[in-house]
Amino acid sequence: MEGYRLLYPMRTYLVVSGHGDEANVMAADWVTVLSFDPFMVGVAIAPKRTTHKLIKKYNEFVISVPSLEMLRDVWIAGTKKGPSKLKDMGITLVPSRKVKVPSIKEALANIECEVYDTKDYGDHTLFVGKVLAYTYKEEAFEGGKPNLKFNFLAHVSWSEFVTFQDKIYRAE
């Protein structure tokens, strides 16, 4: 058992990098909010990944929030290498509002980032992104929180994923 697996299940995201013929998408679980004001996110990516090279080259990336309906695309993004995998995916890349890196039309949300900082930690680089803009499907985020009926994905292990139940438990 790998120790990091003790932190799973974790939300799964798609990280879009590059643009034009270099546009690329990878699946990533290691994504987190780092600051509310200014809004910043962090994503840890191994240097051997194409996404790592493209983020370094363009200093921008987009975090896309997939739903269960995008599971096949998440799987392809996480298991195939390089921009050629886009031909096998059923996603539509669309222009982002503030960055040149495209967003994913089918995603529940797209968070556009410019690289604010990078730091190597062990075998991964933490890319800190300052959020310049975000878009989302209003019905998927009602009342300022996720609408669980939209089946937000979480990664359990290798090919196993779960969604969140529609039942909410409140602490008192």
UniProtKB/Swiss-Prot annotation:
InterPro entries: Flavin_Rdtase-like_dom (IPR002563), Flavoredoxin (IPR052174), Split_barrel_FMN-bd (IPR012349). Pfam families: Flavin_Reduct. Its cofactor is FMN. The keyword Mitochondrion does not apply. Keywords: Flavoprotein, FMN. One of its GO terms (molecular function) is FMN binding. PANTHER family: FLAVOREDOXIN, FLAVOREDOXIN-RELATED-RELATED. Belongs to the flavoredoxin family. This is Uncharacterized protein PYRAB12460. It comes from Pyrococcus abyssi (strain GE5 / Orsay).
